[in-house]
Amino acid sequence: ILMMDYSLKSGENVLRASKEIANAAGADGMIGGQVVDILSEEKETLSEEELKYMHLKKTGELIRSSIVAGAILGEAKESDIEKLDIFGQKLGLAFQIKDDLLDVLGSVDKLGKNTNKDEDKNKSNFVTMYGIDRCEDLCKQLTEECISILNDLTVDAKYLKELTYNLLDREY
């Protein structure tokens, strides 16, 4: 009977995690963000709201949904899943801001790809919107907020903390 209960719960979690990722990939998630990105190529600049929406959906949903799905499959407490949802959004935004910084400040040798791609395509990004100093400050602020959320979980989040710091400190 206990194995049957576990099997049912495990199956429910797999379905819930799958739904989380599927929803994140759909029109209200990554696809929606990509549509905004494509449409933005016709505009000179994006508003701050459009830029955040695009990256929260395009990049952020990939990161957020992966973290939430992992928490679901790991049978985390519902309160922790809700906190990890917010953590994932903030981490996704920090990741994208850092990516925009690296596009301007990084080297081709370290990145393994061409830099200044957004500038070459005349695309809006966080650096063009806020400038380098503000973007660096935003990365640090979002990282601190992420760590604060992780400190508030009911489980040890050592590896997520390590990931968070690595994303801030990355050079590629």
Specify the residue positions occupied by each region the protein language model found.
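All-alpha prenyltransferase/terpene-synthase fold signal
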Residues: 1-172
